């Protein structure tokens, strides 16, 4: 397969153009990664609907950005680290806090536990040991939170994999390395 490039507005179908128009309106541009997903309007529309639905879940915007940073670090996705570092800062995280989250070294016990759960799920193909899960419950999370966290991991892993498959240009300021 040839190198995948970021499609222009004219290269995607009408269903994808609807999503392009939406992002242009809310963000001023269509991020390169979402544009690339737009080669398949089905993939783009189903992904954006899935992520938008997660805004109604356990984790508010700031928490979701923290989760996205952890997942992207563990999956080695430079694009998503860049875009979600920018989003995390807009949602109240400092630069230092984003680095701590990514390294699993947040001073907040809740975030240490979330990091361990995410790391276990990613490294063990969905499994997490009893001790890890007991820690998740001990910081106040329930079954609904576990399902929401799993959904966020899956959604972010999708975009992480798209970037790692395509290596499209990163159109956000690069995240600081750990």
Where are these regions (language model features)?
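Hydrophobic alpha-helical segments
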Residues: 1-178
């Amino acid at each position: 397969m040839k190198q995948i490039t970021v499609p222009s507005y004219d290269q995607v179908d009408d269903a994808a153009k609807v999503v392009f128009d939406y992002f242009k309106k809310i963000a001023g541009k269509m991020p390169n990664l979402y544009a690339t997903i737009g080669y398949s309007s089905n993939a783009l529309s189903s992904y954006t609907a899935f992520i938008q639905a997660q805004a109604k879940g356990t984790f508010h915007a700031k928490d979701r950005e923290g989760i996205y940073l952890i997942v992207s670090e563990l999956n080695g996705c430079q694009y998503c680290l860049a875009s979600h570092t920018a989003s995390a800062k807009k949602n109240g995280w400092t630069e230092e806090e984003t680095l701590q989250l990514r390294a699993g070294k947040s001073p907040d016990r809740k975030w240490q536990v979330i990091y361990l759960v995410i790391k276990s799920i990613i490294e063990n193909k969905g499994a997490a040991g009893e001790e890890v899960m007991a820690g998740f419950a001990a910081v106040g999370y329930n079954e609904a939170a576990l399902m929401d966290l799993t959904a966020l991991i899956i959604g972010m892993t999708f975009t992480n994999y798209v970037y790692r498959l395509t290596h499209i240009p990163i159109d956000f300021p690069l995240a600081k390395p750990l």
